[in-house]
Swiss-Prot record:
Residues 650-670, 1019-1052, 1167-1226 are annotated as: Disordered. The lineage of its organism: Eukaryota, Fungi, Dikarya, Ascomycota, Saccharomycotina. It comes from Eremothecium gossypii (strain ATCC 10895 / CBS 109.51 / FGSC 9923 / NRRL Y-1056) (Yeast). Keywords: Cell cycle, DNA damage, DNA repair, DNA replication inhibitor, Meiosis, Nucleus. GO terms for biological process: DNA repair; DNA replication checkpoint signaling; maintenance of DNA repeat elements; meiotic cell cycle; mitotic sister chromatid cohesion; replication fork arrest; replication fork processing. InterPro entries: Timeless, Timeless_N. GO terms for molecular function: DNA binding. This is Topoisomerase 1-associated factor 1. Belongs to the timeless family. Forms a fork protection complex (FPC) with CSM3 and which is required for chromosome segregation during meiosis and DNA damage repair. FPC coordinates leading and lagging strand synthesis and moves with the replication fork. FPC stabilizes replication forks in a configuration that is recognized by replication checkpoint sensors. Residues 1026-1039 have a biased composition (Basic residues).
Amino acid sequence: MEEMVSQNTEGDKSIDDHWQTEGAETQPGLHETFPLGVLKARVALLATAIGGPDHTSEQEAAPYKLGDDCLACLKDLKRWFVLVDQKQKRWDVASAAAEFRILEEDLIPILVQWEQKMSQGIKQSKVSGLPLSECIKNKQYHGKIALNAFQLMVWMTWPMTLNEESSKNQVHHYSGLKKHQLAYKKAILQAHGGKVVKAAVRIATEVIKIDRLDRSVQDNSLIRLVLNFLRNILAIEPGEVTVSAKQLSKSRNINTSDMLPPNISVDDICLNSVVSVFKKFKVFPFLLTISSSMGHEFEAEYVCLPLLEVAFYLTKDIDPHLLSLKADNPPQSLQNCGNKVSNGQGVVSGQLGMELIHLLDKERHHKMSQIRSSSTRHSRFGGFFSIQTPNNGRLTISNGHSALDHDLALNNIDKKKKWNKTTRNTAEAVQGIPVGVLNGEFNLTFLSHDNRSCLKWFLANFVDSSFNILLKNLIDYFTADEFNQQILQKLQFLLFYAWFLKFERDRCQKGETDGIFVSEALQDTSHILIIKFLREAHELKKWPLVHAAMLAITELLNYLDVLGEDWEEDVVGIYTKIFSNERLKLFSTIPRTASRHSLHYVKACINMNHAIMTTLERFNKNNKDLIIKGFRKRMITRFIVKEGKTTSGDVNGNKNGQDTTRDADEDAISSDEETNMISARLDFKKVLDAYFNGTVIDTYIFYLKHFTELTEEDIKRVLYFLNHILCSNEESFLFRVDFMIVLKEMLAPGGLSVTGHTRIRINEFSDHFMAKLKRKLEKSPFWYINILFPNLHDRELGYYLRYGQQRPNTQSIHKVVAPTMFKHIEGEENMSEQQLKDLKIGVLVSTLLDDGKNHFVEEINRIFKLVVEGYEKHYQNNERSATLHYPRVDFRSDMFDMKRALLFDSDLRALMTTLGYHVADTEVEPCYIGGIFYFPDLSSALNSLEQYMAIPFHTPNGLPSSSYLLRSIDYKSGVDADAKVGEAMRIDQFSDEMADMALSENANRYFEDLNRMEERLEGKQIPRGTAKKRSAIKPKSRKSQPTGIGGIDDDTPVINKSKRKKQLFLSNEFIMDSDDEEELVASPIFYENEIYLRFILNKYQGNLPSHLFSVFSRFANERGRMAGAVVGDYTDLFNGPVPSIEELKSMENSTTHHGLKEILQLQPRDHLSLSPNNENNSAHSSENLSSDSENDNITNDIPLSDSEYNSSNSSQYANTAKTSIIDPPSSKTSLLKLALTHEADVESEDDFIPRKRARKVRLEDGEEY
């Protein structure tokens, strides 16, 4: 109950702000614990003073009469609820109010009386034409009383739950209050024909009459209060709640007695009674009005969650399939009863009749089972056995069949054992969630023919008009406010989503709709939110939420399966997003722990698996490719396959090569360099492999053990998965004793029905399974022992036990780098082949030694020397002079990191290639030497290697050895594993001149950066407080742009297929747009303050005392507020009166004039670069530099904001080679244009160059943001 109060917004609290303040003054002990006796006495006094029956009336039924202080008493009672039940976590006030029957004897009569007065007044107003206020006496006063009584009724009927934070007092009162709420529900539904519900709807309609723009927060809260009242009526039921296992259960008294109070039956509070009252007082049209107009006439934040709860409690116990059946075709269990059931003694109707039918059906099945297994009266004579146990106990068996059937005898003994009651998994118990909410089965809910038709009409109209609107607002709520969400709300949302998709699926199958009315459920936001709930709940181990999410995903897949051809493109698009690699990995992980949970949880898990597998298998059988996409960095390649490598026929193929096909073939992935996205075809075989796990088999066997509780459809889903195991060479997972026992029990006489189709399927599967087992035992006799124990999880041994052979040693295939290329060598045309090879060996050896890789070179020299000596011994001297075919010798080394260097060191790979080795293309391939060689060439290569290891190598050009090498910029990125290295090494299209130019260009940029370093350091030495100018933006030349690998342009083919970054483009619609110049002009006060700041800094020689900084800040802020005027005393800052701005400007002009004149006199004439505007190329005089146009008010320029005006952020312009002097513009407009052009260069570092702020819009993938 305190949850309801805590959920009230400011609008709810504003309803009674006056009495809350008054209560704080009149009640001295706000948070004190009142004695229970005193509290009950005060509640009793309030109950008496509210009102009571008027026995002085002449009417036969005494009418209810309000007390003189009825309104004040109701407010006091509300105050007690807040002060005690909410703030102290006690339910003493609710218990006392239930004891004195306040709701039945006071609140209900007050609301019924107010409803009658309002109804009569409206009729009288229509007849007489008078205003309603004149037809009803004290209308406003009675309205306040009805409103306070209604709010109390909502509080007293609020659903009650226990959790770990519940106090002992709440646990103590829980059982009694639950029974009282059942009595409340009966009274509300039956008192005066249920007119309390009509009064609640009238309270809401009074608010609906007000225009939306004129409604207050209190008005919107009243609509929500009415919806909460309807929700309370639906939610009250004699159910159980889960409580924490950490709390003691001795003092709870929960479930120790019947939850139904005296004189109340199930029919009084069942859903059939609620629907009858709702239909009578037009509650369903009211709900349709609220839900269909959400967002237009009603605020969604007030009504979306209450509507969700109303829809959830209205449908949670109803099977959508029963509602979709026609009235003349009821289900088989109801064909013999209709609305009434005869039990041989009388007629029973309603909910009790439904339960009686269920019990009679169970009794019939038990009798039939007893007849099949029992013997006749004559054969029982003498059929009694007694067995003495080792502990002197005795087991007795009767029945003659026990003597003939040993299994039946043992089963009879087992039935007499006292088994410990199975305990529910405590991890599934989430606080406040009723146990029956996730039972996975729809309870037996009786609905009369009229009520069923009415409910179906409402739900169909709700789907057609309101489902999309409500679902969209709920998704917005759950995606926007993630911190205030309760797990119960998420669970209700998921079950609401699943139920209505199932309901719409039945309608689609009958042709009543085409699926457009639940299109919001097919949006990306919907299934993304559902899978997000699933992932988060699985990580946090919130198993009820996982259960609900699995139901929602299952219904979504089943619904997509029934949509027509018009939806085919949309359905495939949804499949590609649902079946991404990350989500498939999550789906295949959930069944591994399902066997630890309840049977209904396992059922939901198996149904989800079945929906996923059948969907993917349908694509596989129809030879349709399901293309999934993902980002390059996050793409998991576990479930994808190269195009054309796997077909539908490969699904049942051999498993021995599974590990090699499981490896990621990145060349199979279709990549998009521009968008950084990759796509590939989903492989059904690999998806099945993810489910072939011992723990997943445990889940299916656990589910199959309860075959007596499963339907024929449930068993078919299990057999579907087990058949895939048998057909995929994974049958060893099923070679288990417990699985064989389950099959034996199902085929036993007391198992499945002999005439059912399920038994035939199980029998066929059993024959196939036993044939597989027989062949396995003949091939591998060790399975006689292995079958008795659980499966081994050892990687090598488990593989041998399953497949009868050793596990192949395979590795993942990754990329390797291409060997280093050689640039043009001077005079190579005049060299012989042997001389050029000797030079290349010297270059590579010298480069490796310079890089500190001498240990690699020594190891290569040692192994290569052994190879040459072996070849020398193998052939005769006369044979070594010819070109012969030499045997293959693999390169083997025990040196640490040698193998990695042979794959990812391009210089080392180039040396091996030069010596005659074949370098590896992939990680799994070896490096070897062999083939047709001329032996003197090998000997010469060995001599060159040893020579340059001992003697320093001198390059012909005098530069380092690496200057002859053409390397890749990124050494980690190489050629694809499946590509030929020789193809990647082609450089015919790269001219040596281009490579030389690229290398020299890179070197020039490097030295230019070093030269500019001194200029950047010198530029930092500027006076304090002086802003740095920003150099004009110039278009970058082609030479300054980064090039590709080795200086080669990106447009040409490159050596390695490296991944390129996604390019970002700038829109040219905004760059330097100077149309709206007036909007960018700042206040002139800002620049005047800058003049004052420069004056003060110059006065103190750039070292302004710390205490004067705050004084100047106060001075600048005052000038900004007073439009340039100053009223404060700033004598200390200026050492006298404040100078005028005109004086400071004239001082700065004269200082600038003399300073620039001296600079010009010192500059050589040859170094002056004149403005292109001067046709005579004559130098400007000093008068020109001090002209009025240059010293025009700077406040007319385009400024930076205060936060942007920072000298540290200003770019520096340092060019000591030339000094460019710009002819001063003659107007402000020309100054603006000149400041914003790319060619404007300014010579003085002290000049302030205003710049315009340009909005930069980043365009990615061709889209504008």
